[in-house]
UniProtKB/Swiss-Prot annotation:
The keyword Magnesium does not apply. Competitive inhibitor of the HD-ZIPIII transcription factors in shoot apical meristem (SAM) development. Acts by forming non-functional heterodimers. Part of a negative feedback loop. Involved in SAM development and lateral organ patterning. Essential for proper functioning of stem cells in the SAM. GO terms for biological process: adaxial/abaxial axis specification; leaf shaping; leaf vascular tissue pattern formation; meristem maintenance; negative regulation of DNA-binding transcription factor activity; regulation of meristem growth. Disruption phenotype: No visible phenotype during the vegetative growth. Disrupted activities of the shoot apical meristem and/or axillary meristems after the transition to reproductive growth. Zpr3 and zpr4 double mutants exhibit homeotic transformation and ectopic meristem activity. It is found in: Nucleus. Induction: Up-regulated in response to increased HD-ZIPIII activity. Up-regulated by ATHB-14. Up-regulated by REV. Interacts with REV. Interacts with ATBH-8, ATBH-9, ATB-14 and ATB-15. It comes from Arabidopsis thaliana. PANTHER family: PROTEIN LITTLE ZIPPER 3, PROTEIN LITTLE ZIPPER 4. The gene is ZPR3. This is Protein LITTLE ZIPPER 3. Keywords: Coiled coil, Nucleus, Transcription, Transcription regulation. Expressed in the adaxial epidermis of the cotyledons and leaves, and in the vascular cylinder of wild-type torpedo stage embryos. Confined in the central zone and the organizing center in the shoot apical meristem.
Amino acid sequence: MERLNSKLFVENCYIMKENERLRKKAELLNQENQQLLFQLKQKLSKTKNSNNGSNNDNKSSSASGQS
Protein backbone atom coordinates (compact mmCIF):
# COMPACT_ATOMS: atom_id res chain seq x y z
CA MET A 1 0.00 0.00 0.00
CA GLU A 2 2.84 2.36 0.88
CA ARG A 3 4.49 1.64 -2.46
CA LEU A 4 1.27 2.34 -4.39
CA ASN A 5 0.82 5.58 -2.47
CA SER A 6 4.36 6.69 -3.35
CA LYS A 7 3.83 5.79 -6.99
CA LEU A 8 0.58 7.76 -7.13
CA PHE A 9 2.24 10.71 -5.41
CA VAL A 10 5.03 10.81 -8.01
CA GLU A 11 2.50 10.46 -10.83
CA ASN A 12 0.43 13.28 -9.35
CA CYS A 13 3.51 15.53 -9.15
CA TYR A 14 4.27 14.80 -12.80
CA ILE A 15 0.67 15.61 -13.81
CA MET A 16 0.72 18.88 -11.86
CA LYS A 17 4.03 19.88 -13.46
CA GLU A 18 2.71 19.04 -16.94
CA ASN A 19 -0.51 20.94 -16.18
CA GLU A 20 1.47 24.04 -15.21
CA ARG A 21 3.56 23.77 -18.40
CA LEU A 22 0.42 23.50 -20.53
CA ARG A 23 -1.24 26.39 -18.67
CA LYS A 24 1.74 28.64 -19.43
CA LYS A 25 1.73 27.55 -23.07
CA ALA A 26 -2.01 28.26 -23.33
CA GLU A 27 -1.49 31.70 -21.80
CA LEU A 28 1.24 32.52 -24.34
CA LEU A 29 -0.95 31.30 -27.21
CA ASN A 30 -3.84 33.39 -25.92
CA GLN A 31 -1.64 36.49 -25.77
CA GLU A 32 -0.40 35.84 -29.30
CA ASN A 33 -3.98 35.34 -30.49
CA GLN A 34 -5.10 38.61 -28.87
CA GLN A 35 -2.20 40.48 -30.51
CA LEU A 36 -2.99 39.02 -33.93
CA LEU A 37 -6.68 39.87 -33.52
CA PHE A 38 -5.75 43.45 -32.61
CA GLN A 39 -3.51 43.73 -35.69
CA LEU A 40 -6.24 42.30 -37.92
CA LYS A 41 -8.81 44.76 -36.57
CA GLN A 42 -6.39 47.63 -37.20
CA LYS A 43 -5.82 46.53 -40.80
CA LEU A 44 -9.54 46.09 -41.41
CA SER A 45 -10.23 49.50 -39.92
CA LYS A 46 -7.59 51.14 -42.13
CA THR A 47 -8.96 49.35 -45.20
CA LYS A 48 -12.52 50.37 -44.34
CA ASN A 49 -11.47 53.99 -43.78
CA SER A 50 -9.54 54.03 -47.08
CA ASN A 51 -12.54 52.65 -48.96
CA ASN A 52 -14.91 55.11 -47.31
CA GLY A 53 -12.63 58.00 -48.23
CA SER A 54 -12.46 56.99 -51.89
CA ASN A 55 -16.22 56.34 -51.99
CA ASN A 56 -16.90 59.79 -50.55
CA ASP A 57 -14.66 61.36 -53.20
CA ASN A 58 -16.54 59.53 -55.96
CA LYS A 59 -19.94 60.55 -54.60
CA SER A 60 -19.02 64.22 -54.24
CA SER A 61 -17.46 64.44 -57.71
CA SER A 62 -20.42 62.71 -59.37
CA ALA A 63 -22.90 64.87 -57.45
CA SER A 64 -21.20 68.10 -58.50
CA GLY A 65 -20.93 66.98 -62.11
CA GLN A 66 -24.65 66.50 -62.69
CA SER A 67 -25.89 67.70 -66.08
